[in-house]
Amino acid sequence: MTTTVPKVFAFHEFAGVAEAVADHVIHAQNSALKKGKVSRSTQMSGTSLNGNGNTESKTMERVNSVRSNASSRGGSEDGATKKLKKEKERRFKIALSGGSLIQVLHEGLLKRDDVQWGKWDIYFADERLVPFSSSESNYGLAKRKIFDLIDTEKYGTPKIYHIDESLINDPQECADNYEKILIKGFAGRDSVKLPMFDLFLLGCAPDGHIASLFPNFQENLRENLAWVIPVENAPSGPSNRISLTIPVICHSHRVTFVVEGATKAPVIKTIMERPEKGLPSSIVNEGAAGRVSWFVDDDALKDVFVIKKKYKFYDDENLTE
């Protein structure tokens, strides 16, 4: 693995992280809604991160199957109608992980008046297979801390795509079902071999796992066919989960890590100074090189040797990124 240095924005305190992340999210939203999407299918879709030449054909079989079923139900439209509909229905597609990231978004986004919630399609980077009422549920936490608090009459209602709660006792079936949801959400776009999120938001745990991709689960980290995988016997927290895979994360237009707290400092040091260790986030830093940003407070950057940048807020929307 070569050394790839992402952008690292440093902050003195949690409040600064929350405000900057919110600004970053809004900029990504505005870029997506104003500019549309730039396809990277030729960059990522035909070539596996791990060299599996069969990935493209097998993935396309799954995608085409779902698209065929959807088309048979929905009839057909001429090209001009499709183009007009696409422009009118342009959406901001975002993936969220759970944990402390939800609190960061709660603090930063809910006080903003420029969030176009009604144009958001929200997916989850991973999910713990527990009831939504559980404090361990990523969707449940996001619902209580964010979704239930949105003034939908003023800002609109986001479309939220979560797992089927009735499938939490079967990790494989739950993962397969959520993958079908992703395929339906992205298969009509230019890039269909892999979904391309406008923004993929992640945290990073003290043990180095991101989403539900754990450092010592090498088979999961090498997965390059499935979009969503089951994760069983997780070493911390709920043992059964599902997770989006490394290729899906790396295919996003922007990938952003949000990390705070002194307990994260050792793992951040390893990620930034020893990428050859192959932690999941180091793989993402490499696989999505040039599109990765880290928002980290000073506590998590203690004794970390890395170039730190000061985040500049977008006073005026500049869509040159």
Curated annotation (Swiss-Prot):
Biased composition (Polar residues): 39-57
Pfam families on file: Glucosamine_iso
Localisation per UniProt entry: Cytoplasm; Nucleus
A GO biological-process term: tRNA export from nucleus
Start-end of Basic and acidic residues biased regions: 75-85
Start-end of Low complexity biased regions: 63-74
CDD domains in UniProt: 6PGL (cd01400)
Residues the record lists as Phosphothreonine modifications: 320
Residue numbers carrying Phosphoserine: 65, 68
Stretches assigned to coiled coil: none
Note: Present with 1970 molecules/cell in log phase SD medium.
Similarity field: Belongs to the glucosamine/galactosamine-6-phosphate isomerase family. 6-phosphogluconolactonase subfamily.
Name used for this protein in its record: 6-phosphogluconolactonase-like protein 1
Species this protein is from: Saccharomyces cerevisiae (strain ATCC 204508 / S288c) (Baker's yeast)
Gene this chain is encoded by: SOL1
